[in-house]
């Protein structure tokens, strides 16, 4: 017997009892085709049944069986990036230092591990880093707007003018144009009257001013305050070295109650009356609801009709009142539910009586603002109202029975094709749930398919004046559209009504501020909307210079700078929350 060569010593079981799937298939097929074994014999040797061997042979003959990996080009396998993986940790570390993708690529080349800018950007995207926003430092960004890294911004605190730089550049210098009117309204006194809480570090007025700055700069959400942290003008506006961070600003509303907002609005309305931003003598108000839609499925929120979606959706219902004399908002409330929404008209009457000492003279509202029973309560208080009546089947039969001789044509003092409507008046009409009778006007020719039915308890007002007054009610919808566009009122700040309550009150304050600012710009801006004022004036860049007790804001030259030069701006204002320093404006 021939002795086995030492070179052949090994493990024959690796061939006779293969463990890898493809190797076992190969040996079974070889036994069938080369050694001439039957299906059953080849299968028994390598652990297959007879039918499994038949299928294996069939797939092999059909070319469907891949037993060996196809040859590939030399180098790393497709889909792998060993160079990127090797420097991934270093790329992350350099990004946390505030370097851009170009700077990271240059730094890696200097360290002997080169990687192009595109690969660096891909690593940053994979790791969740956003776009790098540059701060004032030449090399490293201090902006917290870059996700995945810590911020170097200091904690919020009252501004220390002793350490404040003598001169600073800012992109928000125009925001400080609103400060003189804040002083006129005496915001610190309003805050104290409302009882807003402060903290050990930040006074209550600065908390409110910080949130107000977000409204005036059209910052959509409180969580977007990061966009303003590096700008000195927004912090100076609130009397702080740096604005509070988003967590602190969000948590502040949780410390408040509805009573805080009501006391603040009462004090604000008194100041608005004194400044001519609201009228106490006429006391005619437009009332309306507005549903702020929630883009989620929070079961706690009730469903209300959302006009922008033409359907009912989960939302926070808010209520607003507008002074018809000045077209300024004077009241807002977000602490409303379906069970209480019908009594909002009564709640506003109570509010205005606390402000002026008497009930409103007249309320103008849509038919869904309140019920007939509440209209009876308003009549008992001596409050006049004008609203629409729902067109029931019986009312439509009554309207259809009228002939052309039953109508009287009147002329309205307004331009357009619908200034000569036809009116049929019923002096005493009974309603289902109203305790007395009301005056009813059936109006056609206003551009609507169906007649408009107006009801009122005012027997003295002339027909022409009543129709004109109700037609002007639509301006409150314009006010709501303005605060949505300018102050992001439709960006729901929370699913908790009390938190939204503070948000809508800040919208009323911001609208009053820009209304006061608008009056200083001259008659050409009498109807300018808040977003126009923000875009043309408040978004102006400039320089802040500190000289002793005087802070001078130099506004950069823009297309509308001549308007500011000729306006009635306060040129020298003492600011209480700046430790009584003076604010001056000048133009470059």
Predicted regions and their residues:
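Short, basic interhelical loop/turn and adjoining N-cap
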Residues: 44-55, 109-122, 199-200, 230-248
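Short, Lys/Arg-enriched anionic-surface-contact patches
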Residues: 2-25, 72-86, 196-203
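Dynamic "connector" segments at or just before major functional cores
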Residues: 93, 136-311, 318-338, 345-350, ...
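Short, solvent-exposed helix-loop connector elements
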Residues: 43, 192-198, 463-470, 486-502, ...
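An anionic, glycine-rich sequence signature occurring as long contiguous blocks
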Residues: 153-155, 160-161, 376, 381-488, ...
């Amino acid at each position: 017997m021939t002795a086995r060569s030492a070179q052949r010593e090994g493990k024959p079981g690796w061939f006779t009892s293969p463990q890898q799937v493809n190797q076992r298939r190969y040996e079974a097929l070889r036994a069938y085709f080369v050694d001439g074994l039957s299906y059953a014999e080849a299968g028994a040797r390598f652990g297959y049944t007879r039918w499994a061997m038949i299928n294996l042979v069939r797939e092999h003959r059909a070319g469907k069986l891949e037993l060996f990996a196809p040859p590939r080009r030399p180098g790393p396998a497709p889909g792998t990036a060993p160079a990127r993986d090797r420097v991934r940790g270093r790329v992350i570390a350099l990004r946390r230092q505030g370097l851009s993708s170009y700077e990271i690529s240059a730094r890696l080349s200097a360290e002997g591990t080169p990687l192009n800018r595109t690969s660096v950007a891909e690593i940053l995207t994979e790791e969740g880093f956003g776009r790098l926003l540059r701060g004032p430092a030449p090399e490293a960004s201090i902006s917290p707007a870059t996700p995945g890294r810590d911020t170097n911004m200091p904690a919020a605190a009252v501004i220390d003018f002793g350490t404040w730089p003598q001169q600073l550049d800012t992109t928000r210098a125009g925001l400080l144009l609103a400060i003189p009117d804040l002083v006129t309204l005496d915001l610190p006194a309003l805050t104290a009257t409302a009882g807003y809480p402060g903290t050990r570090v930040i006074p209550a007025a600065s908390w409110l001013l910080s949130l107000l700055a977000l409204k005036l700069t059209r910052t959509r959400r409180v969580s977007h305050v990061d966009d303003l942290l590096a700008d000195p003008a927004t912090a100076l506006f609130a009397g702080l070295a740096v604005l509070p961070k988003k967590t602190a600003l969000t948590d502040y509303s949780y410390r408040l109650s509805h009573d805080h907002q009501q006391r603040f609005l009462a004090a604000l309305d008194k100041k608005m009356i004194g400044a001519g931003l609201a009228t106490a003598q006429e006391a005619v108000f437009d009332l309306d609801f507005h549903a702020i839609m929630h883009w989620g499925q929070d079961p706690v929120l009730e469903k209300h009709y959302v006009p922008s979606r033409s359907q009912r959706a989960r939302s926070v219902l808010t209520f607003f009142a507008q002074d018809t004399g000045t077209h300024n908002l004077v009241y807002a409330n977000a602490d409303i539910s379906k069970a209480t929404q019908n009594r909002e008209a009564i709640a506003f009457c109570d509010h205005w009586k606390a402000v002026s000492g008497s009930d409103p003279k007249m309320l103008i509202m849509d038919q869904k603002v309140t019920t007939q029973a509440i209209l009876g309560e308003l009549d008992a208080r001596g409050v006049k109202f004008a609203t629409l009546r729902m067109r029931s089947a019986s009312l439509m039969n009554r309207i259809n029975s009228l002939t052309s001789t039953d109508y009287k044509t009147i002329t309205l003092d307004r331009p357009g094709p619908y200034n000569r409507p036809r009116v049929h008046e019923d002096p005493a009409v009974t309603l289902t749930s109203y305790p007395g009778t009301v005056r009813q006007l059936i109006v056609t020719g206003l551009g609507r398919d169906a007649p408009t039915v107006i009801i009122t308890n005012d027997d003295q007002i002339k027909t022409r004046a009543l129709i004109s007054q109700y037609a002007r009610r639509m301006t409150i919808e314009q006010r709501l559209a303005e605060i949505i566009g300018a102050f992001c009122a439709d960006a729901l700040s929370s699913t908790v009504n009390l938190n939204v309550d503070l948000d809508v009150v800040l919208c009323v304050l911001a609208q009053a501020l820009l209304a006061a600012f608008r009056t200083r710009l001259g008659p050409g801006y009498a109807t300018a909307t808040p977003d126009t004022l923000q875009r043309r004036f408040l978004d102006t860049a400039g320089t802040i210079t500190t000289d002793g007790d005087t802070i001078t804001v130099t506004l950069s030259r823009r297309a509308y700078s001549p308007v500011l030069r000729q306006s009635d701006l306060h040129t020298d204002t003492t600011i209480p929350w700046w430790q009584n320093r003076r604010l001056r404006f000048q133009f470059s």
